[in-house]
Curated annotation (Swiss-Prot):
InterPro entries registered for this protein in UniProt: Ribosomal_eL37/eL43, Ribosomal_eL43, Ribosomal_zn-bd
Xref: PANTHER family: LARGE RIBOSOMAL SUBUNIT PROTEIN EL43
One of the record's GO molecular function terms: zinc ion binding
Protein name per Swiss-Prot or TrEMBL: Large ribosomal subunit protein eL43
Record Gene3D superfamilies: 2.20.25.30
Organism: Caenorhabditis elegans
Zinc fingers classed as C4-type: ranges: 39-60
Family: Belongs to the eukaryotic ribosomal protein eL43 family.
Keyword list, A-Z: Metal-binding, Ribonucleoprotein, Ribosomal protein, Zinc, Zinc-finger
GO BP term, example: translation
Top-level taxon of the source organism: Eukaryota
Amino acid sequence: MAKRTKKVGIVGKYGTRYGASLRKMAKKLEVAQHSRYTCSFCGKEAMKRKATGIWNCAKCHKVVAGGAYVYGTVTAATVRSTIRRLRDLKE
């Protein structure tokens, strides 16, 4: 593992390359993709990224398609709320 500092965190592996602002953007993405998320099926904080857009729960072993870097996306939330609203209108 590459040595990281307190200030730069996970992007310390890039050293002085690519510029500070690009490293800040990369840090935001990398922290999001490596963190654990709450599983929508079992409620445990065990959802981890397996590959690009594929999320796996370590507890209930559900595999879900999600965002590339985060479990849930803004578009998915919009679609979910639209479907819920249309279902309520139908009833």
